[in-house]
Amino acid sequence: MKYQQLENLESGWKWKYLVKKHREGELITRYVEASAAKEAVDLLLTLENEPVRVNAWIEEHMNPALLNRMKQTIRARRKRHFNAEHQHTRKKSIDLEFIVWQRLAGLAQRRGKTLSETIVQLIEDAEHKEKYASKMSTLKQDLQALLGKE
């Protein structure tokens, strides 16, 4: 496992995930009967600051169909959490107009690279082009100076 699991922190994330799904109208419990489901959800809502009991609630009451999605969400959140600790791994976001994103995504796909790798490559290409233009300009000036002296 690449990222360390922090039980207390992740229990809080699981609690928030389940509460969010409940508020969005998803069935978060394994119970078909409405009163049993409501009772289990009410219990969950009281467990915000009790990580051990949140995990026990998940084992006992959670809808099994939700388990995989929750694991994926927590795994992604764990990755973002640990990547945010270091400047070089911290993710940044930029706003792009749809057409710009579409063109960039197409270019990245054709090159078989990620969006970030494609952007870096485009920047490097532009820098090389600037260097080349500067060298050509200097060469041209030197050549004109040589020809002008004769």
Swiss-Prot record:
Keyword list, A-Z: Cell cycle, Cell division, Cytoplasm, DNA-binding
Domain of life where this protein originates: Bacteria
One of the GO biological process terms: cell division
InterPro entries: Arc_rbn_hlx_hlx (IPR013321), MatP (IPR009390), MatP_C (IPR035375), MatP_N (IPR035087), MatP_N_sf (IPR038339)
Record Pfam families: MatP, MatP_C
Gene Ontology MF terms in the entry: sequence-specific DNA binding
GO cellular-component term (any): cytoplasm
Entry's localization field: Cytoplasm
Subunit structure of this chain's protein: Homodimer.
Similarity remark: Belongs to the MatP family.
Function: Required for spatial organization of the terminus region of the chromosome (Ter macrodomain) during the cell cycle. Prevents early segregation of duplicated Ter macrodomains during cell division. Binds specifically to matS, which is a 13 bp signature motif repeated within the Ter macrodomain.
Full protein name: Macrodomain Ter protein
Source species of the chain: Citrobacter koseri (strain ATCC BAA-895 / CDC 4225-83 / SGSC4696)
Designated gene of the protein: matP
